[in-house]
Amino acid sequence: MKKIESTQELEKAVKDDWSVFMFSADWCPDCRFVEPFLPELEANFPEFTYYYVDRDKFIDTCAEWEIYGIPSFVVFNEGKEVNRFVSKDRKTKEEIEQFLTDSLAKA
């Protein structure tokens, strides 16, 4: 997973093919919960490029994109939002897998 460091990087990544943005924060226990199985998800869904977005560093983007809970996931394809899994609830591996499968089905 690539870490987004600037607004310019984020804007460029949004325009790529099949980008998954994970909004997270170091202090978030539910975000830490998903970390152990993220590499497996990345391997099982190679169609996507995965990006980590620090909620605290990109607080304005979170407001603009209506990211009000973390961890949250947003999928873009060629500059268009395809799907989102945004809530304050803890996400399971199975829920994220279903989200990624559903995102690809919207192609």
From Swiss-Prot:
PROSITE patterns: THIOREDOXIN_2 (PS51352). Residues 1-105 form the Thioredoxin domain. InterPro entries: Thioredoxin-like_sf, Thioredoxin_domain, Thioredoxin_H-type-like. Keywords: Disulfide bond, Redox-active center. Disulfide bonds join C28-C31. Induction: Up-regulated in response to depletion of tryptophan, phenylalanine, tyrosine, or availability of charged tRNATrp. The keyword Nucleotide-binding does not apply. Gene3D superfamilies: Glutaredoxin (3.40.30.10). This is Thioredoxin-like protein YtpP. It comes from Bacillus subtilis (strain 168). The gene is ytpP.
